[in-house]
Amino acid sequence: MRALIVTAVTAEADSVVRGLSGPVPHPDHTPGPDHAREDGHGPRTLPGGYLIHRRGAFDVLVAGVGPAAAAAGTATALALAAAPDGYGLVVSAGIGGGFAPAAPIGSLVVADAIVAADLGAGTPQGFLTVTELGFGRSVHLPPAELAARAAEATGALLAPVLTVSTVTGTAARTAELAARHPLAGAEAMEGFGVAEAAAAHGLPVLEVRAVSNAVGPRDRDAWRIGEALTALADGFRALGPVLASWGGPS
C-alpha cells in the first residue's frame, strides 16, 4: 500500500525520509526509470510549490505550517496521485508539544484521535466545538488496529493529539486544554487539516508526533528540537514496515 506522509517543514520531512531509508519496497510495484529518479535524486515539486520525496512505498510531503496549509498541501498531493497507483493511507507526522508527564521530551505519540482543539466558538458557558455548533466534525479517528500496531512498533504513547492554530504558551491555556481533553498526549498544528483532506478523498489517516517540548508556558530554551527530530527518524525506521504491510481498514 502506498502512503502519503505529510509534514509541515523540511526538517521534519528530512527526518522521516532518513528513517525510511533504505526504502521499504512497495509490495506490488517494480521500480521503473521515473521511480528510480525520484528515489535517488531528491524531491519533486508539485503545483503550488510543495516538495515531495519518494521512498519506496511512501511519498513524504512538505505542506506548510498550520491546519489550513496542511489541508491544502495534502489535498493537492491526493488530487494529483494517479489511479490506480494512488494512496491507501495518509499520515500526519512531525514534532509537537507533549502533555506532561505522559509524553516527555524525546518520546513519540501516536494519535488514537485527531482533535480540532480550538475550532469552534467561545461562550459564557465555555468552549463549543464545531460539532456542537452543528457545522461539521471536530474529531477524526485513525484505524484503531493500525494506530495500536504503530504505537507498539515505535514504543509510542497511544493518545489523542490536539490540533491547534496557536501553540500553547501559558499555564492557563494548558490547564484549559487539559480539562477539556484529559487524555491528550500531544498538541501540534497540522493533524486535523491533514485528516480533513484525507477524509474528503475517502482515505484513512494516522498521526505521529515526536515531542520537542512540554505543553505549557513558552520557554524556547527548554525545547529539544534536535532530539525530537532524531526520535521522529527512529520512529519511522520502526514504523515503515508496519505501514507498508497494512492491508487497509478491516
Residue ranges and their predicted role:
Residues 1-73, 80:
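N-terminal short beta-loop-beta anion/metal-coordinating cradle
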Residues 2-4, 88-91:
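Structural motif
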Residues 61, 91, 109, 157-162, ...:
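Hydrophobic/aromatic beta-strand patches that form the interior of the parallel beta-sheet core
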Residues 80-88, 201-203:
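Glycine-rich phosphate-binding loop signature in dinucleotide/nucleotide-binding domains
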Residues 99-181:
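Mid-sequence, gly/pro-rich, charge-dense loop/helix-turn segments that line enzyme active sites
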Residues 166-207, 212-218:
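A C-terminal functional module that forms or caps the active site or interfaces directly
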Residues 215-250:
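His/Asp/Glu-rich mid-to-C-terminal helical/loop segments that flank catalytic regions of hydrolases
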